[in-house]
Amino acid sequence: MPRRRVIGQRKILPDPKFGSELLAKFVNILMVDGKKSTAEAIVYSALETLAQRSDKNALEAFEVALDNVRPTVEVKSRRVGGSTYQVPVEVRPVRRNALAMRWIVEAARKRGDKSMALRLANELSDAADNKGTAVKKREDVHRMAEANKAFAHYRW
């Protein structure tokens, strides 16, 4: 840990189409090999498809999907006296968003649909309906934390 000063988080510019910082972060997570315009095209196409399917606008549907995937608790390994315990800890808000976005992108990449935009649209619509792989991942993390609640006093 540095002794001089703590460096603050970088300010992220909102995306050009919707003006949302969350969406800009999502584009950055989806981006591969620095191809931002490709990632933006995929995300915007997926949001367009999502808006056609649901009665909400694209950004609202995206935020509902993200909200359903955000974890509140996770487990961290903690070594105490030669044995390792999975200690449940609360997830900070910035990390909640980051994990949710990462899980949605991972789940979309594993799907078997034709294009990435379609995969992403399907995963986002599943997440908005509280189903799908990303939501299952959140449920698994919550289940692990619930199962290891006995070790919560090892929190640091």
UniProtKB/Swiss-Prot annotation:
Q: Which InterPro entries match?
A: Ribosomal_uS7, Ribosomal_uS7_bac/org-type, Ribosomal_uS7_CS, Ribosomal_uS7_dom, Ribosomal_uS7_dom_sf
Assembly, per entry: Part of the 30S ribosomal subunit. Contacts proteins S9 and S11.
Is this entry keyworded Lyase? Answer: no
Superkingdom assignment: Bacteria
Q: Which organism is it from?
A: Enterobacter sp. (strain 638)
CDD domains, alphabetically?
A: uS7_Bacteria
Q: Which GO terms describe its biological process?
A: translation
- What is stated as this protein's family in its record? Belongs to the universal ribosomal protein uS7 family.
Gene that encodes the chain? rpsG
Can you supply one Gene Ontology CC term for this chain's record? small ribosomal subunit
Give the protein's recorded name: Small ribosomal subunit protein uS7
Task: Give a short account of what the protein does.
Answer: One of the primary rRNA binding proteins, it binds directly to 16S rRNA where it nucleates assembly of the head domain of the 30S subunit. Is located at the subunit interface close to the decoding center, probably blocks exit of the E-site tRNA.
- Entry keyword set: Ribonucleoprotein, Ribosomal protein, RNA-binding, rRNA-binding, tRNA-binding
Respond yes or no to whether keyword Ribosomal protein is given for this record. yes
